[in-house]
């Protein structure tokens, strides 16, 4: 049981997991104290800090190599504002993956938040040979926004993924694994223990999905090796459990089915209401374009 208090005390806190949610909750709590709250935080998404700076709230940020030191003082009043939330890279990632896996394809996805703490997938895919560029870049309410142009490569390269990309791609790794399944060679992703703390143990489920598809994958408690097959075509039946209830596993499975073929039985489509209720409607427009 958690009971609220009207007299919050300022604290000093070390956030060492790279959790933007944890960091932001302490920042918001610090707004209501009568002192200075100090957070030493491992590098993670910084949307809250950018919004606070845009609103000219009393926040100070010192950036070091692996840590941010954030100071927040009491906030007496916040001016109201109108804010149109930009499109999210974690939703765009599914259509980026579909384009990359389709071959000889291009896509422009408009009005995406390209905050440097969010574009780990872009950095990873560029290392895998995918051509990606930002168009019409601008700053909106402190956040960098752009249209993203993606072109599928002739050959997807395998990679030994730098772990410093992890926090900026943590929600996109399932589709990154899917792309690695078609890469030439062995891809290795490390220090991914946080993936197993999501809606489902995604590192485990990512390896299961690849194995169902016929891809060799070796998984440990915090890493995965994926043995890519550029010629992969699925001709068997694959069933994804209705008890999983993970929106990203469901949507990744849809992209796999469209990209590699096979007979897929996907349950619990209601899970996509968590983040992307219009996903299947948009996917159907892709299918219709393909037919035309």
Language model region names:
Residues 1-292:
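Structural preference for solvent-exposed beta-strand-turn elements
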